[in-house]
Regions:
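Catalytic domains of carbohydrate-active enzymes, especially glycoside hydrolases
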Residues: 56-74
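Histidine-acidic metal/acid-base catalytic patches
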Residues: 2-62, 136, 194-216, 220-304
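Glycine-rich, proline-tolerant flexible connector loops at the mouths of alpha/beta enzymes
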Residues: 70-90, 144-148, 188
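Active-site acidic/histidine proton-transfer and metal-coordination neighborhood
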Residues: 9-18, 29-33, 91-92, 110-213
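Catalytic-core regions built around general acid/base machinery
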Residues: 84-91, 166-170, 231, 262-266
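Mid-chain, structured segments of secreted extracytoplasmic proteins
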Residues: 83-115
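Active-site-proximal loop/turn and secondary-structure-junction residues that shape catalytic pockets
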Residues: 45-47, 75, 102-105, 146-148, ...
Length: 304
């Protein structure tokens, strides 16, 4: 019995399923699914089924049919682990999604326009280029900080745009893309500068670079502004990446109010070839709950 068969046997036993290892692969619970879009799980999403080892988790994701992966914390992982994860992703056909290049949830770093804060931002962008090279990433996330209550929003926007223009000049020669993530004020992140999709669209147009795009987090934008498909349509030319989570709760699709089947149908119809990050929790914290996440994605992906 090889390692994967043993893992499957252990899972079935823990779920109370009396299934012979020789026939497990033919059962729907382990049948590799062909998804229509590139949904990207993250480390920890399937730890009860796959174990704590990130390599085992990546293998498990690929076994289920996922073709992408995202990891907010990739930049802080040991270089040796980054290299191992990159190798297994290439071997198993997992495309690397975002990691976080820059974030500040407490200070008006980019909006304030202070040179020290801008220099620190650009330093982190340069460091993220090296991470991206190691793990074959194209996209990474930028959260520009909070609003500056001492400046009018127009001045803040100019400050943010200038920082992003300088960052873009670093990224363009490498073909890398920072994706700006608007985050909601009403539930999770009150006071952040970037909060709405039209605002992010305006900033990307002002920066005017292929290396500066929008991370459209469907969970956050449902809370902040709603009107999801029309806003996606308006922002389409500046969207580089999507993230997923249902509302309320920020769990897997089908657990809240968002009609993900229709949203994914629209995204697919527009021939989106990018990644949709599964940046949400699981509604149930056990093996059965992790299987439920997989089944939820099969359900909302059935739009063809």
């Amino acid at each position: 019995m090889n390692r994967r068969t043993f893992t499957r046997a252990s899972i079935c036993a823990s779920l109370g399923l009396a299934v012979a290892p020789s026939v497990m692969a033919s059962q729907n619970i382990f049948k590799k699914h062909q998804f229509n879009l590139k949904y990207a799980p993250h480390i920890g999403m399937f730890k009860n089924l796959a174990g704590d080892d990130p390599i085992d988790q990546l293998n498990f994701m690929a076994d289920q049919g996922f073709t992408a992966f995202e990891d907010n914390n990739m930049g802080t992982r040991p270089i040796s682990l980054q290299e191992k994860m990159s190798a297994i992703m290439q071997k198993r056909g997992l495309e690397m999604g975002v990691f976080v290049a820059y974030k500040d949830f407490k200070n008006p770093t980019l909006a304030g326009g202070k040179e020290e804060a801008r220099s620190d931002f650009l330093k982190q962008i340069k460091a993220s280029v090296e991470v991206a090279k190691r793990v074959n990433a194209k996209w990474f996330t930028v959260v520009p900080g909070t609003v500056d209550l001492r400046l009018a929003e127009g001045y803040q926007t100019v400050n943010v745009v200038e920082s992003l223009k300088q960052a873009s000049s670093i990224l363009e020669p490498h073909g890398l893309v920072m994706v700006l993530e608007p985050l909601n004020w009403y539930r999770n992140h009150p006071g952040l500068f970037l909060r709405e999709s039209p605002q992010a669209f305006n900033i990307c147009r002002a920066v005017n670079s292929s290396s500066c795009k929008i991370l459209f987090d469907i969970y956050h934008q449902q809370i902040q502004e709603g009107n999801l498909i029309p806003n996606i349509e308006k922002c389409w030319d500046e969207i580089g990446y999507f993230q997923i989570g249902d509302n309320p709760g920020r769990k897997e699709p089908t657990t809240g109010e968002i009609n993900y089947n229709n949203i994914f149908k629209y995204i697919h119809k527009r021939n989106f070839n990018g990644i949709l990050g599964m940046e949400h929790g699981n509604s149930r914290p056990d093996k059965a709950g992790e299987l439920a996440v997989i089944e939820a994605y099969k359900s909302v992906d059935s739009f063809i």
